[in-house]
Amino acid sequence: MLFRKHLFNSSEKNRIVAAIAAAEMQTSGEIRVHIEPHCKHHVLARAAEVFSKLDMHKTAKRNGVLIYLAYEDKRFAIIGDKGINDLVPDDFWDSTKEEMAKYFKEGQFQAGVIHGINESARHLAKYFPHEAGDINELSNDISEG
């Protein structure tokens, strides 16, 4: 795989942010994407660290989801907050991760992330449907490390 200095250009980032906004119309859950070139620790530990730094645990229903990518190390994770984890099976994110990995192996990073966003929203909507008056509690922007 050939990597660029930055994983996504501004147009690709805009499409991802738009996908997050659209996905959050299906669920009261909050979805964020964080990208960085390297992950020096275990990928889930780093994702949890980023989750905390982004204050994702401060949503009213504790239903935030982080899609974390360390693109040069070819590692990624999806983690959810306590409100989600208390309701779903341990393997809740596995199928979404497997599908995203297929896109990534083909070098289709934007498509893989958008697929992950859409699938996350679809799964979350079963437990946390969108509600009238729902507010966007977290930024939809991609964070970078």
Q: Whereabouts are the PLM-identified features?
A:
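A structural boundary signal for the start of the first folded domain, especially the loop/turn
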Residues: 1-145
